Amino acid sequence: GNEHLCGKRIILGMNKPIERQGGFAEYVSIPDQNIYELPKTLEMKEAPIAEPTAVSLHAVELAEKAYYKSLKDSKVLVIGGGAIGLLSGLILSKVKGCKEMMIVDLNEKRLKECSKYLDAQTLKPDSKNVMNDHFDIVFDTVGMEVTRQQAIKAVKPGGIIIHIGL
């Protein structure tokens, strides 16, 4: 039923001590409902990005359902310019029509990569241009204590924070 609420749940490669090996183990036991067969039309070089794309799409759809304004009219901050942050940004801008978005990351190379694909302002998080109480929606794709605090500072009163990173 609600496995995600179980106090004794075990997550692949995530529990300490590790009780269940992760995805790089030689063999892994996974419940049937968690296995998806990839379509034959999906190329092998595209398959690895299916999971992060699904995670990003799910997060964007959660934000869309939870917030009263449309995504295209919302001011959005994405904390983290890695795979999930970039994919979330792509879905927000290319699919949902979000016009005002900012991506923050410590890594200059990631910010440059994001700016190639997104029409979004890219900044390091210590920049004075990251505004407090400014954003309708904040996506934290990093999941560290410091990024949680950045999200709390950046979101407007009444805005929402979507925590994606673990």
Enumerate the predicted regions with their spans.
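Glycine-rich, N-terminal phosphate-binding loop of Rossmann-like dinucleotide-binding domains
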Residues: V142
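Short, acidic/turn-prone active-site loops that include or flank metal/cofactor-
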Residues: N107, P125-V130, G165-L166
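A short acidic, Gly/Pro-enriched loop at the edge of an enzyme's catalytic core
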Residues: K128-V138
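Glycine-rich phosphate/adenylate-binding loop and adjacent beta-alpha elements
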Residues: G1-I35
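Mid-domain Rossmann-like dinucleotide-binding core that forms the NAD(H)/NADP(H) cofactor-binding site
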Residues: L42-P125
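Short loop/helix-cap segments at secondary-structure boundaries that form the rim of catalytic
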Residues: K112-Y117, V130-N132, H163
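Glycine-rich phosphate-binding loop and adjacent beta-alpha segment
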Residues: E145-L166
